[in-house]
Amino acid sequence: MNTAMEETQRIEQFLRKALVSERKHGYLIGVSGGLDSAVVLKLLVQAVGKENVLGLILPDRDTEKKSTTLARSLLEQEKVPYKVISMTPLLRHLGVYKDMPLFLLPTRGLKESIVRRFYNDYTKKLNKPVFFAQWEEPPTQLPYFYEGIAYYRIKHRVRMATLYYYAEKNDYLLVGCTNLSERLIGFYVKYGDDVCDVAPIAHLYKTEVRQLSEYLSVPEDIRNRPPSPDLIPGITDEYSLGINYETLDQILAGLEEGKTAEDLKQLFPADIVELVINQVKFTQKLEGKPYMLKRA
């Protein structure tokens, strides 16, 4: 990556050009209270001005209250107009909450504890972190396994439909907040948080986004939060992956530089290297879907 200042200027120019090229009136962004959307919001304001940005906060029943508080605070600090729209009524209407009856548990702490208990059991039986095994056939029946996957993914897809509705209603471009680390290993929901019109940080590893956040003076409360999709209580990014972003990014950067698996195994645990390499290959295959016939 360039210096933080150079990269910021490069992205801001990119955002201005995209708006002119697409002949749109501004940008719409979903703001979660997390690091990636905070960085992108800061870049948008500096690139095109707060009057050309609209923020949406889209919590649901499982969203941590602090996430919404931090998202509101950042948008108000940047003087960006925004709306808060609860996804709970639609998800309830679809019957999503019945599939994972967390509402029966009285406190968030208890919900997090139960979710992690199931997650740890899955990891033990699958012999790898659940993220790296979610596309495989489980060796044994796992309670709530597929329901949990569907529960997680539908939230991203409902959010995406909502974001696009408001983007098109205002003749805005929808800006995405997926980073390069997530893209390379498929740590996103297809037809969910990967979908957007402009992806200004998709070329930056998570650790590089973190560097930009310091340069852009993203509030410390956001910078210090563990990265989390905030869709199921108790599950953070690194808990789901079973690996921290510093290690993940070093492995991914090593692959980008042409290092072999054996080279990387001299520096990192062999099982982690294998998981990451296999996941990168699988993600490349996943991006080729849907399957289609060629013309006869």
From Swiss-Prot:
Keyword Transmembrane helix among UniProt keywords: no
Associated pathway: Cofactor biosynthesis; NAD(+) biosynthesis; NAD(+) from deamido-NAD(+) (ammonia route): step 1/1
Listed transmembrane segments: none
Protein EC: 6.3.1.5
Gene Ontology biological-process entries: NAD biosynthetic process
Chemical reaction(s) catalysed: deamido-NAD(+) + NH4(+) + ATP = AMP + diphosphate + NAD(+) + H(+)
Binding site for deamido-NAD(+): R157, K190, D197
Pfam (any one): NAD_synthase
Family (UniProt): Belongs to the NAD synthetase family.
Protein name: NH(3)-dependent NAD(+) synthetase
